[in-house]
Amino acid sequence: MDRVILLLSVVSLGVSSQPITDGQRLFSIAVSRVQHLHQVAQRLFFEFESSLQTEEQRQLNKIFLQDYCNSDNIISPIDKHETQRSSILKLLSISYRLVESWEIPSRSLSGGSAPRNLISPKLTQLKAGILLLIEANQDGAELFPDSSALQLAPYGNYYQSLGADESLRRTYELLACFKKDMHKVETYLTVAKCRLSPEANCTL
């Protein structure tokens, strides 16, 4: 409780004339962590994609465009304008859910030379940091009133042994969705952080 009260005090100072606050530092750490994860996601995806034949790339991309990511079930802003209109707490809550949805699937991410075994722990660290920011911005609001939405079904065929073609498709889907979701979280946290500085231009 003392930690939450302290963080609430810190975040309230974010609108004052002080150039840097502890609240902003917490946001900076979270943004830095998700930027790193987004870079890892991009590297994993592009290294995997470059290992495919041109026709395989074309077919998988076509299938992915017709498919959807599990995390699409998490209600989030549909465009940059809605993102900019969303409250800090809403952006943090969506980010938390997106990060949490990848803690288990990230363990099976493959491709390239990126440190795959470190992804899940880094997601857990990021989730913990976002939770601190949520607690600091709650102001008495219930954390996740629609908690049932947090329970997402596993990715299709996630627990099954697959043939070569289906395994290729699942890997492509996981990497593409992971990259997409880390980009979302990076955007949401960056906008939320910007809101702490009233003079800042938070245009996407």
From Swiss-Prot:
Signal peptide location: 1-17
Keyword annotations from UniProtKB, A to Z: Disulfide bond, Hormone, Metal-binding, Pyrrolidone carboxylic acid, Secreted, Signal, Zinc
Disulfide links within the chain: 69-177, 194-202
Gene Ontology molecular function terms on file: growth hormone activity; growth hormone receptor binding; metal ion binding
Modified sites of kind Pyrrolidone carboxylic acid: 18
GO cellular component: extracellular space
Biological process, per Gene Ontology: animal organ development; growth hormone receptor signaling pathway; positive regulation of growth; positive regulation of receptor signaling pathway via JAK-STAT; response to nutrient levels
Residue positions binding Zn(2+): 36, 186
Subcellular location: Secreted
Pfam families in the record: Hormone_1
The family this protein is said to belong to: Belongs to the somatotropin/prolactin family.
Stated role: Growth hormone plays an important role in growth control and is involved in the regulation of several anabolic processes. Implicated as an osmoregulatory substance important for seawater adaptation.
Protein name: Somatotropin
Organism: Sebastes schlegelii (Korean rockfish)
